[in-house]
Each structure stands twice: as C-alpha cells, then as structure tokens.
Curated annotation (Swiss-Prot):
Protein species of origin: Elusimicrobium minutum (strain Pei191)
Major site of localization recorded for this protein: cytoplasm
UniProt entry tagged with the keyword Cytoplasm: yes
GO-annotated cellular components: cytosol
Designated name of the protein: Ribosome maturation factor RimP
Cellular compartment(s): Cytoplasm
Amino acid sequence: MRDIKAIESVVADGLANQGYEVVDLIVQNQGSKKLFQFFVDKEGGINLDDVEKASRLIDSIIEMENLIEGAYILEASSPGIKRVLKKPEHFKKFIGQRAKITLKQMIENRANFTGLIAGANETEMTLDDGTTQFKFKYEDIKKANLDPVLEF
C-alpha cells in the first residue's frame, strides 16, 4: 500500500477534475482489511447523488492507479456539519462560522479553543471567543472542526 498522503493526493487530483474536493481521508483497520473513509465536498454543497458519484470515481481511481494492494473497504461521505478544517482555504471559506481548535501544545494552560473564525490567510487563522482574538499558525493546530450551534 502506498503512503496515505500519496493516496489522498492522487484521489484528490482525480476528483478535482470532476469538481469534487477530498476534505479528509481516515484509514482504520477493519478486521483483516483496511477501511478507507473519504470525506468529499463540492462548491455549493454535496448531496447523496454526488456522494455516490464520488464513491464510484474514487474506486476507479484506486483501481486504475493501483493505489491499494489487497482487500479494502471504501466509504465516501459528506464532511458533515462538524467538518474538519485542514487547509487555509477551508478556514477562509468559513470565516464567521463557529469552530473548535485543538492545538498541538498548550498555550495559556489550554489546548482547546472555541469561537468564530475571524480571519485567515496562508499561514495562520484568527479565532474570536467573544472576549479575545487568538492567532494560531496552521502548523500549531492539531485538529480543527466547524462547531455549529444547533437550535431546535
């Protein structure tokens, strides 16, 4: 099996030609097989038909490029409402939205921050928790997700 980043990159390039973005790839052991979970999106949002189409495209890319050896399980899904934020473009796209940020190392005796994405550029993002604006370099972020407040 190729490196996970290489698999993600090849699949992302193939899907980009069809207007889809690979937001994240999670690989887990599932018994004797590997489970590959691709989270995909597109401009304007993704629906069930898009997910099915993306799944078929991912499967054909994996087979054509011989990316994975042996038996595997493939899942394609939308990123969901708590979608992961990995690239500067993700943070820029969701300026004004609520997010939860987990840092690799603690600052001010904490590693978790929640607030609105107040800004983003190529090297860092700004999070406003209502009282303070924090600037975090992307390289210092361990995990970032949208964290919407759901009202019923």
